[in-house]
């Protein structure tokens, strides 16, 4: 439709390619850890596994911050891809916010310790899985922007698909919570957690839209 070019943005440097690949890897890995964190929390595991996972997310977030600084240094010190420099840095910043949202959810579970009745466990786990799938699709979208720009639109469509699925699951679970016999304050507390998880998809979709705009800019 837009005659997108298929050339790689990394034609001049493998170092930058490795750095950005490493950042996207971390975003993907944080999501996979988070997918396990929620069922681990719900199982009331007493062996410290939940706390270990939260600490792992914290460590990966720190690594992502370090890579962001390295990419910024590489772009400016070596004057690479000047026409796309600001877009790349903005993209990394927004993906870093996504990692922060994962981390924030972990901390909220750790500190506030919401009491989800067993009847809601499976729905919460499925919502979490959909959210992680959405971010995984975003990772593919970002990689395609740097490697094979013709694939950006197809991968971005997958992000939108999972975002809509997440909205459906969120609405269904929130409705079930408020239809239950739980006290109102507990209903509000549980809804807060469900909504915070769902918002990760909203951020992922915003970033995917951003990437598609950058892809169009590269094609003209």
Describe the residue ranges of each PLM region.
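Cytosolic, long alpha-helical scaffolding segments
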Residues: 1-220
């Amino acid at each position: 439709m837009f005659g997108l070019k298929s050339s790689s943005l990394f034609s001049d440097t493998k170092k930058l390619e490795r750095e950005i690949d490493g950042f996207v890897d971390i975003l993907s890995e944080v999501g996979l850890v988070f997918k396990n964190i929620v069922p681990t929390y719900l199982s009331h595991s007493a062996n410290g596994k939940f706390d270990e996972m939260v600490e792992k997310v914290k460590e990966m977030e720190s690594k992502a911050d370090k890579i962001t600084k390295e990419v910024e240094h590489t772009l400016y010190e070596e004057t690479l891809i000047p026409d796309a420099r600001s877009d790349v840095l903005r993209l990394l910043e927004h993906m870093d916010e996504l990692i922060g949202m994962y981390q924030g959810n972990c901390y909220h579970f750790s500190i506030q310790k919401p009491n989800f009745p067993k009847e809601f466990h499976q729905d919460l786990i499925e919502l979490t899985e959909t959210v992680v799938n959405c971010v995984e699709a975003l990772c593919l979208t970002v990689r395609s922007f740097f490697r094979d720009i013709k694939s950006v639109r197809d991968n971005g469509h997958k992000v939108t698909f999972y975002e809509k699925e997440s909205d459906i699951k969120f609405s269904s679970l929130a409705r079930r919570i408020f239809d239950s016999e739980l006290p109102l304050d507990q209903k509000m507390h549980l809804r807060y957690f469900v909504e915070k998880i769902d918002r990760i998809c909203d951020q992922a979709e915003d970033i995917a839209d951003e990437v598609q705009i950058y892809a169009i800019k590269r094609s003209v």
